[in-house]
Regions:
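Cell-wall glycan-active module
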Residues: 1-245
Length: 245
């Protein structure tokens, strides 16, 4: 801590190869700290060098390193061409809505700076698909600056499918566990039911069942897992509950 110069000396001298570093993911934590310290000192080119020479190839640290490298390139070096490759690497190596919207938004910013309006709008629209995230909302404001946004309506489950769902023995078991105050054991059953037929609404039915027995936490879990695969059940992911008495 506080030894930026001595740390920098080490980071600039060592070989930036995976074989040499052995665990470049462990080195990244220090690189991140030093890079941010250098930004504070307005040493932007050195900060970019430290961030981008990470020797990572995959994993969350790789994604984080690529985003930071792109951010420094775009925001401080004013080099959108350099930033573009980093943001693309980030976007292609993440899967959660919060990260996908982040990558899409910054790609939109990058193409905007390059003067490529169509590409910029394309990425902002991609980011705006994730309206429950910060960058999703920023993306929406870029594409539709004067329009309010609404979360997508919940898909409607076929009435016959819903009727058959509630006839299942496992569903009856969930209600029984609730009556016996043993609803904590229903978590994995609900997860199983949610995975039965996702395209036909099994996740929605499982989340509703969890809500029926006041296990909003289980409903959120089902909905959040679905959101990782770009199926958004916002009614259950962000429930409105009564104030406890």
């Amino acid at each position: 801590r506080g030894r930026v110069d001595s740390s920098l000396e080490i980071l600039l001298k060592i070989k930036n190869t995976k074989d040499y570093l052995v665990r470049p993911d462990k080195w990244w934590k220090e690189r991140s700290i030093i890079a941010r310290s250098l930004i504070y000192k307005k040493k932007y080119e050195t900060a970019y060098r430290i961030a981008s020479k990470h020797a990572l190839e995959e994993g969350p640290e790789f994604a984080e390193a690529e985003w930071m490298s792109g951010w420094i390139a775009l925001s401080f070096l004013n080099d959108p061409i350099l930033a573009k490759s980093h943001f693309l690497n980030f976007y292609q190596n993440v899967g959660y809505p919060i990260s996908l919207s982040r990558g899409a938004y910054w790609l939109g910013r990058t193409y905007e700076k390059l003067g490529k309006k169509e590409e910029s709008i394309k990425w902002y629209k991609e980011g705006s698909l994730y309206l429950t995230t910060y960058y999703g909302q920023l993306s929406h404001m870029k594409v539709y600056p004067n329009e309010n946004f609404e979360l997508n309506n919940l898909m409607e489950v076929d009435k016959k499918i819903a009727e058959n769902f509630y006839k299942k023995d496992l569903v009856k078991l969930i209600y029984l566990l609730d009556e016996l105050n043993k609803d904590k054991y229903s978590k994995h059953i609900l997860r199983y039911l949610a995975n039965e037929n996702k395209l036909k609404g099994s996740e929605i039915l499982a989340a509703k069942l969890a809500t029926d027995i006041s296990r909003y936490d289980f409903a959120i879990q089902v909905s959040k897992i679905a959101s990782y695969e770009k199926r958004f059940h916002n009614k259950f992911n962000y429930p409105i509950i009564n104030v406890p008495k």
